[in-house]
């Protein structure tokens, strides 16, 4: 087939007419210095703070120090292939992470990349890691309870949806157990949970993930893990990635529980980065903005007003102390930011009181207004009773001649301590908590031997499940305390069938 000259010229003419001259201008720089996960870059004059920088090897970095002649960048990945003189370029993007329902049930790193071997996360939605916290007028007061399933917390230091409650204590005092049990208790609470593991051993994270999977809690949980083997920048951004994922659900009107385990390791990672970036050190060698590091994170937990959907983020940050020193720099910072703290004491833990909650030093500043009426009524005097028992206990060690009133208080105190003990991974519904605490405060346990208290509680819960379902359902649905007669008849009837152990 012959091609006519006119056709060729017409084709060329149309191509020339449609040709658009495009020039892609990319801001590039050069690596001046590299080492310890930090790169000094020359030439990126217009870079933004917190912008992602792309290296020749494809690894991304985060712009931190913006100076006149160079930029300090923390590298988010392996940096063995990055050399002095390498070309780097701006991306024009602030760091973002993938968000959405597709992440539920997955284990991801702080960049949102899956690390559980179950294929890619198929979500197109992203959110910036750093975001301004919700404003004052967009919030509402905390008025809904978040039940942890742990008697000592729900009775003494109640937590409300949208609250920030610190869990603080020495290593090996059960801080993570309290957080995991709280996640397990959200199974029927319509709450999405996010567990952020910061600087933990991979084996520990794996064990926690398996526990969540066995209990069916992974069906409503996202795990964000920056392990001890990851570079310091990953530990630094992990909590911000977790809360960005949580905000997606909060602004969709859902309730979210987020656990930061633990912020001490994040502060240490930030200190490491700051010292490598030559920022001036302050108290305990932390940089001057270590307070802002945690305040801008924890302020993102909120209870939104009804106009914005009424969603919430409840934060449970964990802080590890050294030898019970809660007056150290980072612990005091986080205590001042949060709405209360649960203080776990190693002395109590090793004496068999678990969870090892020190009721005297634990407080919830806003959760009381969210506590259900039934619990507020039965547990109203519990904290004072426990405090006076601790005082009398130390006093009673020095003398055996105790008056009848003191002896009764001591006996009641022993039973209170026993009731507040709880096995790990066995959260208790709030209605069952109300039942046993009512029995305690009204004196129904005074004639039960201390060694039988745990068995009494277990058998009472089993008995109530089949014989007092209406009573339990009334507490569960209304939150109010049923009439005393209903409680009294139920507990009295059960006590007839309970057999005390032989002395």
Swiss-Prot record:
This is ATP synthase subunit alpha. The gene is atpA. PROSITE patterns: ATPASE_ALPHA_BETA (PS00152). Belongs to the ATPase alpha/beta chains family. Produces ATP from ADP in the presence of a proton gradient across the membrane. The alpha chain is a regulatory subunit. PANTHER family: ATP SYNTHASE SUBUNIT ALPHA, MITOCHONDRIAL. It is found in: Cell membrane. It catalyses: ATP + H2O + 4 H(+)(in) = ADP + phosphate + 5 H(+)(out). Residues 114-135 are annotated as: Disordered. GO terms for molecular function: ADP binding; ATP binding; proton-transporting ATP synthase activity, rotational mechanism. It comes from Staphylococcus saprophyticus subsp. saprophyticus (strain ATCC 15305 / DSM 20229 / NCIMB 8711 / NCTC 7292 / S-41). It is an enzyme of class 7 (translocase).
């Amino acid at each position: 087939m012959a091609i006519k000259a006119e056709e060729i010229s017409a084709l060329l003419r149309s191509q020339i007419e449609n040709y658009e001259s495009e020039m892609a201008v990319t801001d590039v720089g050069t690596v001046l210095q590299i080492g310890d996960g930090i790169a000094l870059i020359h030439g990126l004059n217009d870079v933004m703070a917190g912008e992602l920088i792309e290296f020749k090897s494809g690894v991304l970095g985060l712009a931190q120090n913006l100076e006149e002649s160079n930029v300090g960048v923390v590298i988010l990945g392996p940096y063995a292939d990055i050399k002095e003189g390498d070309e780097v370029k701006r991306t024009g993007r602030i760091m973002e992470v993938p968000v959405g329902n597709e992440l539920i049930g997955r284990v991801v790193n702080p960049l949102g990349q899956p690390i559980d071997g179950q294929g890619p996360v198929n979500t197109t939605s992203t959110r910036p890691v750093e975001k301004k916290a919700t404003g004052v007028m967009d919030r509402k007061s905390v008025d809904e309870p978040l039940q942890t399933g742990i008697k000592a917390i729900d009775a003494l230091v109640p937590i409300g949806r949208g609250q920030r409650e610190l869990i603080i204590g020495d290593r090996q005092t059960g801080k993570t157990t309290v957080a995991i049990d709280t996640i397990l208790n959200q199974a029927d609470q319509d709450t999405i949970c996010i567990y952020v593991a910061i600087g933990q051993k991979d084996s520990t994270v794996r064990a926690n993930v398996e526990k969540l999977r066995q209990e069916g809690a992974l069906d409503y949980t996202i795990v964000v893990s920056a392990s001890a083997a990851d570079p310091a920048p990953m530990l630094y951004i992990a909590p911000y990635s977790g809360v960005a994922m949580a905000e997606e659900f909060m602004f969709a009107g859902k309730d979210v529980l987020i656990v930061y385990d633990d912020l001490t390791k994040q502060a240490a990672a930030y200190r490491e980065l700051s010292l490598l970036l030559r920022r001036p050190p302050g108290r305990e060698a932390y940089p001057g903005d270590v307070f802002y590091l945690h305040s801008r994170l924890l302020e993102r937990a909120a209870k939104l007003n009804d106009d914005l959907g009424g969603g919430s983020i409840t934060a449970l940050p964990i802080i590890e102390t050294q030898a019970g020193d809660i007056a150290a720099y980072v612990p005091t910072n986080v205590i001042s930011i949060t709405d209360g703290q649960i203080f776990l004491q190693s002395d109590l833990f090793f004496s068999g009181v678990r969870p090892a909650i020190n009721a005297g030093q634990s407080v919830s500043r806003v959760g009381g207004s969210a506590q259900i009426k039934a619990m507020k009524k039965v547990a109203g005097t519990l904290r004072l009773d426990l405090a006076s028992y601790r005082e009398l206990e130390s006093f009673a060690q020095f003398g055996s001649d105790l008056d009848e009133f003191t002896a009764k208080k001591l006996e009641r105190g022993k039973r209170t301590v026993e009731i507040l003990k709880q096995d790990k991974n066995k959260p208790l519904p709030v209605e069952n908590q109300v039942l046993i605490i009512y029995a305690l405060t009204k004196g129904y346990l005074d004639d039960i031997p201390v060694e039988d208290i745990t068995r009494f509680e277990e058998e009472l819960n089993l008995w109530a499940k089949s014989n007092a379902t209406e009573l339990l359902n009334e507490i569960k649905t209304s939150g109010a305390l049923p009439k005393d007669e209903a409680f009294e008849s139920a507990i009295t009837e059960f006590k007839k069938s309970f057999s005390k152990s032989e002395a």
